[in-house]
Structures are given as structure tokens and as C-alpha cells.
């Protein structure tokens, strides 16, 4: 039996990855992290989506220590999410160490249940300036986990080389575009579905959807080509 662990936030990207994982694996587990994020609604949305998609194994893990160490607009209510980059060249929504911690803990969970893969929705094409969404980082951490646990494990990144329009196309390929659009929470201001329309996350999501709906055939063809090359 093939098992996988999906790092699941209830957002567009992780939900699309989950939908794909359900098709590709015999048993899918989800893990969601409570790190004192700006909106607790994120966890409720994640729980609701997993139930709707028939996932029976969904672990919500308390990693509040990350909130104590990582100061970000996503961990502090008194810091407004900004469209401008900080002096270090990163957006103020970057939570340092988040994906390092999440993927490491997910790898441990995969070890315990005998899963062959950890699946995450990080994406270098639309990575918003986050260094821990880069392919180079994921491959490096993957190697460290394999060495540290002396067990084969693959961190899968189905969206790594897709832009947002192609990510919408992937959801549509599984006949779940409307589900992803209506049920997920991507907005930094905590509004489900199409969101506030003003934050950086909503801007990226909306632009991708508009692009896909306007150029469906061409974008779907691009997605299929990337899938044939093993890039999705």
C-alpha cells in the first residue's frame, strides 16, 4: 500500500496537492500546523476540507514555539501585511524556519506511519520571495531527512514549476476548480474563497485565475507538457 503525508494548510496550493495525492496514493494522511498564525480560521478550513474530501487521518500539530521565535506579519496581529519588501529583500509575511520545521516534522510523521512521500505545495515560480520555497532548499532538506532517519523518503513538490494559472489548470484537470476556488483560504486577511482582493496572496491568486479562465486551452496545454516532462 502506497502512503503519503500532505502538508496541509487549507489554501489553494495544498488543497490542489491533496486532490492529486488522493488520486495517486492508496492512503493519504494530512498534517496541519498550528503555529499561532494570524487566522485560526485556517485550521478550521483545513479540517473542513479534509472531511469533505474523505480524509480520515488528519493530524493538527501545535508548534507554537515557532510563533515565539519568528516575527512576521503572519504571526503578529499588530504587523500589517505589506506589499513592499523589507530591507533584507523579503516580504514581511515570510516566517523564517517555517518550512524547515513543517517538512522535518512531516518527515518524522511519514517515518512513523511508513509513508513513502511528503507532499508540499511550495512553488518556486510564484514563491513570493520566500527562500524556503525554492527547489534547491527542498532537495537539500530531503537529503538531510533521508540521511538523518536512514530511510527512503521523497518530498514531492507537484507545483514547484507551475505558475498560478497552471495550478488552477491542475485543479480543473481533476474537475475540482470550483471546489478549490470556493472552499480554500489563501487570503492573508482571513477571507475564504476569492478573499479580500487586496493582499499579496489574493493578488497572485486572482491574477492566476483570470489568466487561466481567459486562456484555458493554452494554459492546459502548457500544464500537460510540463506533466509529460515530469515537472508537475
Curated annotation (Swiss-Prot):
Q: Where does this protein hold Zn(2+)?
A: 187, 196, 199, 202
- Enzyme kind, highest EC tier: ligase
Pfam families named in the record: QueC
Record keywords:
ATP-binding, Ligase, Metal-binding, Nucleotide-binding, Queuosine biosynthesis, Zinc
Catalysed reaction, written as an equation: 7-carboxy-7-deazaguanine + NH4(+) + ATP = 7-cyano-7-deazaguanine + ADP + phosphate + H2O + H(+)
UniProt record similarity statement? Belongs to the QueC family.
Q: What is this protein called?
A: 7-cyano-7-deazaguanine synthase
Q: Gene that codes for this? A: queC
